[in-house]
């Protein structure tokens, strides 16, 4: 919005030229989202407490979690509001990629909101069914993928990390299916990771910061050519979007850090994962998400292995509990130690993913 309002004024006052620069708008998108999360956090915590929207704790989990029962949840409303407002304020709204990213974020957020609302407000034990939630995610991701591929004539090749000239073409239908897999998979992986105080939000912010770099580099022809990656002119505005994700995440962390005053709920975890997935698609760094979000992959795989092994062996388990962060808790690791060590893993994976820009 500010880009369109203030950039034309540059011919009268050169100071307004700064609004042309993606780096400037990315920084201020991040700061705006951070301030929104930071300022509105106490009000939301108090409001959710008054509404008795409190977290339900599984009795078969770590006993140390029982004291968290009743902690306000659905804090993802704050994150999503901050991200969307900040992006609308600072991004170039004529860029179709901005609307695709916001559409996926809003769509997945709405699914998470309905799920949380049914459980927390209407007191339904399970909210949306797993199948219903999955189908809705597929619909949202499918619409986004179709608009990108058919509406915008998007590139249907896939960039393979570490390989310079390996870019298989999936064809239009194949790429739409692939995009659905990336977005829905990322969304559910982040959702599974959100089980400890601050565990999910920091890796999300780290991943968003990494894709901020990918988006900026891909949008510049010289950088993209030098690094032998796909040049995506429209991806520059994804830096602004990612900046908003980073800022909103850090602002939310202030209240979500151990011991948490608020949890994000599905209304936070589902759209955050979906946002990472759609940015990966739009920047043509789809498979890099497996590295950038390796922590989320590890959490999701631990659940898949646990469930599969349990069914095959008729009752045996690989881990003490899944997702894997609970396994380490039950082994005796204090919750803060699990959280910080997982953050360290996320940082290492982010650095590795950035190295793929040059190692090819």
From Swiss-Prot:
This is Phospho-N-acetylmuramoyl-pentapeptide-transferase. Catalyzes the initial step of the lipid cycle reactions in the biosynthesis of the cell wall peptidoglycan: transfers peptidoglycan precursor phospho-MurNAc-pentapeptide from UDP-MurNAc-pentapeptide onto the lipid carrier undecaprenyl phosphate, yielding undecaprenyl-pyrophosphoryl-MurNAc-pentapeptide, known as lipid I. It comes from the Bacteria. It is a multi-pass membrane protein. Keywords: Cell cycle, Cell division, Cell inner membrane, Cell membrane, Cell shape, Cell wall biogenesis/degradation, Magnesium, Membrane, Metal-binding, Peptidoglycan synthesis, Transferase, Transmembrane, Transmembrane helix. The chain crosses the membrane at residues 25-45, 73-93, 94-114, 134-154, 173-193, 198-218, 240-260, 262-282, 287-307, 337-357. One of its GO terms (molecular function) is UDP-N-acetylmuramoyl-L-alanyl-D-glutamyl-meso-2,6-diaminopimelyl-D-alanyl-D-alanine:undecaprenyl-phosphate transferase activity. One of its GO terms (cellular component) is plasma membrane. The lineage of its organism: Bacteria, Pseudomonadati, Thermodesulfobacteriota, Desulfobacteria, Desulfobacterales. Its EC number is 2.7.8.13. InterPro entries: Glycosyl_transferase_4, PNAcMuramoyl-5peptid_Trfase, PNAcMuramoyl-5peptid_Trfase_CS. It catalyses: UDP-N-acetyl-alpha-D-muramoyl-L-alanyl-gamma-D-glutamyl-meso-2,6-diaminopimeloyl-D-alanyl-D-alanine + di-trans,octa-cis-undecaprenyl phosphate = di-trans,octa-cis-undecaprenyl diphospho-N-acetyl-alpha-D-muramoyl-L-alanyl-D-glutamyl-meso-2,6-diaminopimeloyl-D-alanyl-D-alanine + UMP. Belongs to the glycosyltransferase 4 family. MraY subfamily. Its cofactor is Mg(2+). Pathway: Cell wall biogenesis; peptidoglycan biosynthesis. GO terms for biological process: cell division; cell wall organization; peptidoglycan biosynthetic process; regulation of cell shape. It is found in: Cell inner membrane. It comes from Desulfatibacillum aliphaticivorans. It is an enzyme of class 2 (transferase).
């Amino acid at each position: 919005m500010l880009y369109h309002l203030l950039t034309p004024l540059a011919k009268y006052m050169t100071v307004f030229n700064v609004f042309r620069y993606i780096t400037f708008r990315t920084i201020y998108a991040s700061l705006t989202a951070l301030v929104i999360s930071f300022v509105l956090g106490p009000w939301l915590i108090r409001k959710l407490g008054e509404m008795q929207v409190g977290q339900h704790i599984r009795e078969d989990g770590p006993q140390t979690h029982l004291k968290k029962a009743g902690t306000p949840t659905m804090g993802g409303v704050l994150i999503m509001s901050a991200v969307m407002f900040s992006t609308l304020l600072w991004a170039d709204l004529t860029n179709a990629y901005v609307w695709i990213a916001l559409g996926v974020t809003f769509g997945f957020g709405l699914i998470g909101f309905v799920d949380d609302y049914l459980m927390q407000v209407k007191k339904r034990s399970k909210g949306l069914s797993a199948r219903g939630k999955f189908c809705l995610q597929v619909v949202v991701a499918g619409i986004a993928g179709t608009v990108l591929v058919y509406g915008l004539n998007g590139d249907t090749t896939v960039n393979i990390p570490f390989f310079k000239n390996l870019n298989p073409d999936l064809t239009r239908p194949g790429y739409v299916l692939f995009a659905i897999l990336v977005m829905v998979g990322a969304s559910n992986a982040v959702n599974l990771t959100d089980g400890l105080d601050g565990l999910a939000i920091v890796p999300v912010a780290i991943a968003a910061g990494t894709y901020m770099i990918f988006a900026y580099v891909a949008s510049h022809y010289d950088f993209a050519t030098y690094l032998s990656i796909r040049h995506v002119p429209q991806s520059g505005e994804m830096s602004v979007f990612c900046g908003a994700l980073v800022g909103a995440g850090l602002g939310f962390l202030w209240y979500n850090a151990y011991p948490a005053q608020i949890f994000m709920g599905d209304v936070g975890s589902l759209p955050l994962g979906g946002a990472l997935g759609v940015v990966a698609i739009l920047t043509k760094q789809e498979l890099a998400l497996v590295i950038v979000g390796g922590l989320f992959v590890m959490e999701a795989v631990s659940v898949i292995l646990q469930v599969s092994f349990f069914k095959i062996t008729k009752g045996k388990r690989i881990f003490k509990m899944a997702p894997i962060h609970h396994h380490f808790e039950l082994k005796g690791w204090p919750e803060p130690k699990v959280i910080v060590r997982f953050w360290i893993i996320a940082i290492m994976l982010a650095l590795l993913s950035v190295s793929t820009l040059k190692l090819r």
